[in-house]
Design a protein with these regions (language model features):
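Non-catalytic, solvent-exposed segments at the cell envelope interface
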Residues: 1-170
Length: 170
């Protein structure tokens, strides 16, 4: 049938997303990794937050997402609310809320741009970490990641993190 790709994720997780992409686009996919909003909040907090520069319009919408995520996690929202637009250090709640905004700017296109920005800022932040720090971070983060990557490949990828973190997200 004709459904959105995110429906495959909701109904069958990573394996169904992979099969859907392979069947519809004839693209082979060897491995996948996925995180949900809760995990992304924790991962961003684990790296110490990131720098973002949201507009006043964006923070109005982002704060609604902050409220929702805090309510679902039984956390006081006031500590995670944006108070103003502009360049600032943000925590996991604020960064995920920023990445979720779809009703400011050019709808979904700008939302995916914000998502790439958050991922790029995370990678930029981790670039200054040593291999030992990156390995410890991977140990903390990996339990939050759903994937089909075998242990041997994961260990190889962790060793290659300094190179991987230099890649540009497009």
């Amino acid at each position: 049938g004709v459904k959105k790709l995110n429906a495959a994720c909701a109904y069958g997780g990573g394996p169904l997303v992979v099969r859907t992409i392979e069947d519809n686009y004839k693209l082979p996919i060897d491995n996948y990794a996925s995180v949900d909003f809760d995990s992304m909040i924790d991962i961003i907090d684990d790296i110490g937050g990131i720098e973002l520069s949201p507009s006043d319009d964006e923070i109005r919408v982002a704060n609604q997402y902050v409220d929702e995520m805090c309510r679902l996690r039984n956390v006081e929202a006031s500590a995670h609310q944006y108070t103003a637009g502009g360049e600032q250090h943000v925590d996991g709640y604020q960064a995920v809320a920023y990445a979720r905004i779809r009703y400011v700017g050019n709808s979904d296109y700008q939302r995916t741009e914000r998502q790439r920005e958050v991922l790029s800022k995370m990678m930029q932040k981790m670039k200054s970490s040593s291999v030992t720090e990156l390995s410890a971070l991977a140990d903390t983060i990996l339990p939050s990641v759903t994937h089909n990557i075998d242990q041997s490949t994961l260990m190889t990828l962790i060793g290659e993190l300094p190179t991987i973190l230099s890649y540009e997200i497009v």
